[in-house]
Amino acid sequence: MDLAKIGAETRQIVLDVLDKAALVEGDIFVLGLSSSEVVGGHIGQNSSLEVGQVIIKTILDILEEKGIFLAVQGCEHLNRALVVEKALADKKDLEIVNVLPTLHAGGGGQLAAFQYMKDPVEVEFIVAQAGLDIGDTAIGMHVKHVQIPIRPILKELGAAHVTALASRPKLIGGARAAYTEDKIRKG
């Protein structure tokens, strides 16, 4: 596995998704990562700390420069809990849960997040403005409504399928909406 190539492609994908999602300082970006899928294995079966480290470090460097928070989703064994900075958990009044990820419960990405974040904690729920899914991990439960699929510049990272989501406020009305006749305001 060419880790330098994984890092370079991660950077390319993240910058593209951030541009398309139009995130701003203070927003939250969720990452779902199957390092198993990146290395060509089946999700949850071939976790790689080294791959997790390269991807997390690359993403953190980009997001920290922009003032955007990272939330790293864990696997189903941790009920898809997320690693975030304690400062974010405090700011958003997120409930912290007591668990430490392992390579096979949380995964390589969560382990790397615990290594590279300043004060990492696990939270059970979050509402992010956008996110990146590397390896079909299903991040939708953590992205606010209304979710908008983004087609990243690259469709794969290593052997993993890559998708992304942005979000927008709900449109209540507008050009496509239909209304019943307003008999009170008619005329």
Swiss-Prot record:
What InterPro entries would the database entry show?
Antibiotic_NAT-like, DUF436
The UniProt entry, under Gene3D superfamilies, shows: Hypothetical protein TT1679
Family, per entry:
Belongs to the UPF0340 family.
**Protein name according to UniProt:** UPF0340 protein SSA_1999
What is the species of this protein?
A: Streptococcus sanguinis (strain SK36)
